[in-house]
């Protein structure tokens, strides 16, 4: 049987990435050109800057991904691409490159939801057993997803306001930490003590919804009031207290979801899945199901995860025409 090679593109935010997946499960290359240094001085991602960077490097990323995989353009079987959610200008760069490659070589084009990519990155660890539950935590999303089978995703709970990664970046900015602040807050949290009483919104409510705006506001108010009074607060203790509140919320809602949807597997994915504190809490508190977390290199935005997610779409022959457009607000269906 002839080997199948999927060339995948990911440009939904500030990483330009191209990957090659062989026969459903062998990731031959996963090239990532990060723009973090360009956005640090702005304290966040500037959409126009992100789009321009994608344009500048995407051709080189394609060439490097193919070379690293040891294949040529003629060996590629199909092209997969993120078409949402994300920044519309950034998405369009990846879409344009993917569609051009597919058209030039007469290849099928596979549309992939960015969040499905995060979830299916877990496939790189071990074959997934369905049905499963997923906790997706990133800079733009915090949601619990029920997956009845590969490619069938239903939201069962999500944030009412800020995403967890967004909350990390906002409190990091208040403390003067560099963007993105998640990793630094995690490191500082392990050096401090949970001594500040921050709110855990909706933690006792019988639903699967999250809220982080109250926690974020309480943190900002505490920091601001201390500054006004000329008081000095321990950055380590602030980070430890903030992270403890975040983890309490995530753990409480995830446990409720596992009670409501009895599954054997929990996938935890997205950029925040790289958080050491989250991994520690999962290891000690959720022991009755198989918890799968993608390796660190596949937690952030990358095309490898898009390639993994494209396999189920290929199997369903879910191909797109060349008029495929960006859907910046694309979302999974909600469980009825």
Curated annotation (Swiss-Prot):
Catalytic activity: L-threonylcarbamoyladenylate + adenosine(37) in tRNA = N(6)-L-threonylcarbamoyladenosine(37) in tRNA + AMP + H(+)
Disulfide links within the chain: none
Cofactor detail note: Binds 1 Fe(2+) ion per subunit.
GO biological process: tRNA threonylcarbamoyladenosine modification
Record GO terms (molecular function): iron ion binding; N(6)-L-threonylcarbamoyladenine synthase activity
UniProt KW keywords: Acyltransferase, Cytoplasm, Iron, Metal-binding, Transferase, tRNA processing
Binding site for Fe cation: 114, 118, 301
Pfam family, one: TsaD
GO cellular component, as recorded: cytoplasm
Cofactor(s) this protein cannot do without: Fe(2+)
Subcellular location per the Swiss-Prot or TrEMBL entry: Cytoplasm
Highest taxon of the lineage: Bacteria
EC number: 2.3.1.234
Positions that bind substrate: 136-140, 169, 182, 186, 275
Protein task: Required for the formation of a threonylcarbamoyl group on adenosine at position 37 (t(6)A37) in tRNAs that read codons beginning with adenine. Is involved in the transfer of the threonylcarbamoyl moiety of threonylcarbamoyl-AMP (TC-AMP) to the N6 group of A37, together with TsaE and TsaB. TsaD likely plays a direct catalytic role in this reaction.
Protein family: Belongs to the KAE1 / TsaD family.
PANTHER family: TRNA N6-ADENOSINE THREONYLCARBAMOYLTRANSFERASE (PTHR11735), TRNA N6-ADENOSINE THREONYLCARBAMOYLTRANSFERASE, MITOCHONDRIAL (PTHR11735:SF6)
Protein name: tRNA N6-adenosine threonylcarbamoyltransferase
Origin species: Streptococcus pneumoniae serotype 2 (strain D39 / NCTC 7466)
Lineage of the species this protein comes from: Bacteria, Bacillati, Bacillota, Bacilli, Lactobacillales
Gene that encodes it: tsaD
């Amino acid at each position: 049987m002839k080997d199948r090679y999927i060339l995948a593109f990911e440009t939904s935010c500030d990483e330009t990435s191209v990957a090659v997946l062989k026969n459903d499960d062998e990731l031959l290359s996963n090239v990532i050109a990060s723009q973090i240094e360009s956005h640090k001085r702005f304290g966040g991602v500037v959409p126009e800057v992100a789009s321009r960077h994608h344009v500048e490097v995407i051709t080189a990323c394609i060439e490097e991904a193919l070379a690293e995989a040891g294949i040529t353009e003629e060996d590629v079987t199909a092209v997969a691409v993120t078409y949402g959610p994300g920044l519309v200008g950034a998405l369009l760069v990846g879409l344009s490159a993917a569609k051009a490659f597919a058209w030039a070589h007469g290849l099928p084009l596979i549309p992939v939801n960015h969040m499905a990519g995060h979830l299916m990155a877990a496939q790189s660890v071990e074959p997934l057993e369905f049905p499963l539950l997923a906790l997706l935590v990133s800079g733009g999303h915090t949601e619990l997803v029920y997956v009845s089978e590969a490619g069938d995703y239903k939201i069962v709970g999500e944030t009412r306001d800020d995403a967890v990664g967004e909350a990390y970046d906002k409190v990091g900015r208040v403390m003067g930490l560099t963007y993105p602040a998640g990793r630094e807050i995690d490191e500082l949290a392990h050096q401090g003590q949970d001594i500040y009483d921050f709110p855990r919104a909706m933690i006792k409510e019988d639903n699967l919804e999250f809220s982080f705006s109250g926690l974020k506001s309480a943190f900002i108010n505490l920091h601001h009031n201390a500054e006004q009074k000329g008081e000095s607060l321990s950055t380590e203790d602030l980070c430890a207290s903030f992270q403890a509140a975040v983890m309490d919320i995530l753990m409480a809602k995830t446990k409720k979801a596992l009670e409501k949807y009895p599954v054997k597997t929990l996938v935890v994915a997205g950029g925040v899945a790289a958080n050491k504190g989250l991994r520690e809490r999962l290891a000690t508190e959720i022991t009755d199901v198989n918890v799968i977390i993608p390796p660190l290199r596949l937690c952030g935005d990358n095309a490898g995860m898009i390639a993994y997610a494209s396999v189920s779409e290929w199997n369903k022959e879910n191909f797109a025409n060349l008029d495929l457009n960006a859907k910046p607000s694309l979302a999974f269906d909600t469980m009825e």
